[in-house]
C-alpha cells in the first residue's frame, strides 16, 4: 500500500503479511516505484521468522528512508536511511536500555535522524547484596 502526501512531496509505502510469520524475506515487487521526491518505507520484521533481511537488501529497494519495526530495542548505531526506533516503552524485563522514538528529516535526498528518549519507565539490572539479617524495609531503602 502506498499513501501520497503531495503537500510534503512524500509518499509512504508499507507491506503487510497475512500470516503470523513470514520467513521468506524481502520481495522484489516491493522495490520503490518513485512518485514523489521523498519515498519512505515502513517495514516490520528482521528476525529469522518475521521477514528476515539485512541492511543491504533494504538499501537495494531504493527508498529514501526505511522505518523498521519488530525489534523493541532502538538501534542507536544504525543511522542514515534505515533505522529501528524500538518501542516507546519497555515491554518486558529483557527490554533494558533507552526507549523512545526517531524523528527525522529528508531534504534533497539527505536523511537526518535523531533518537529521542521518551519512556516513562525502565527496567534495570541491579546487584544488591542481601543477607539473613536484611528486612523488607531495608531492602526497599537500598532500592531507592
What are these regions (language model features)?
Residues 2-6, 85-144:
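Binuclear metal-dependent phosphoesterase catalytic core
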Residues 1-83, 87-100, 105:
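His/Asp/Glu-rich metal-coordinating catalytic cores
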Amino acid at each position: 500500500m502506498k499513501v501520497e502526501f503531495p503537500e510534503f512531496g512524500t509518499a509512504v509505502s508499507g507491506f503487510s503479511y497475512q500470516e503470523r510469520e513470514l520467513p521468506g524475506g524481502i520481495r522484489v515487487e516491493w522495490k520503490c516505484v518513485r512518485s514523489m521526491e521523498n519515498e519512505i518505507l515502513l517495514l516490520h520484521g528482521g528476525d529469522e521468522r518475521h521477514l528476515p533481511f539485512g541492511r543491504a537488501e533494504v538499501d537495494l529497494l531504493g527508498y529514501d528512508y526505511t522505518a523498521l519495526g519488530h525489534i523493541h530495542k532502538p538501534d542507536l548505531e544504525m543511522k542514515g536511511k534505515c533505522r529501528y526506533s524500538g518501542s516507546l516503552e519497555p515491554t518486558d524485563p529483557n527490554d533494558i536500555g533507552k526507549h523512545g522514538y526517531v524523528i527525522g528529516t529528508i531534504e534533497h535526498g539527505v536523511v537526518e535522524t535523531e533518537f529521542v528518549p521518551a519512556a516513562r519507565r525502565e527496567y534495570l539490572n541491579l546487584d544488591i547484596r542481601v543477607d539473613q539479617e536484611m528486612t523488607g524495609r531495608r531492602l526497599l531503602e537500598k532500592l531507592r
